[in-house]
Amino acid sequence: MLGAKAWAENRTDEDISRIDAFLLVDMIGDADLKIYRTFPPYVGDEEGDRLWGAVRTLAGPLGLIDNVTDCGGNPGLDIVNFSTTDGVFDDHVPMIDVGIPAIDFIDIRYGENASVWQGYWHTHEDTPDKVSAESLAHIGRLLELGLREGSWLKVQVNQTEPMQHQEEAQASTFGPVVIGAVFTVIALIFVGFLGLHESVRLKR
């Protein structure tokens, strides 16, 4: 985590303000892939809830949630599951410490029926044949869909606001426009009256 800490601490305030999300992808190649919500960020953290909420929203249509039908009409797999939360201090934590919204995609039960931080993790059994291309693809598609949909971006200004401001602007100019029109009509009537009066006077 030293490299992540050094990187985070070297970001300027301007750098940090321009980063909408830091998505750490760590240990997601397990054939028996299970992605649980990790903390920090803790439940109730606004940015953490936003990002994990996006994960849940994206995972359903991709078929990564058990008993949720995917966009192709197929039953979902039990891959993304928020019934359990795991405490994991990983390379995303230094980002959170400096104010960058960050979450961690990680399967800390590496191997079939493995318990927390057990299985093949940090053993000689952690070999390339244990890595599942399908599992990597599942997370890759989720991340890509999130990018395409703008799901990782911070909450944007409500798009109805410009229209609201436009209506307010129209309302604020309506009064002066009406008053101006009324004065114009009065002026025309007055000019017409003067012209008529002058015409009558000349005839006399």
Stretch-by-stretch model annotation:
Residues Q159-V185:
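Juxtamembrane/start-of-transmembrane alpha-helix segments at the extracytoplasmic/lumenal side
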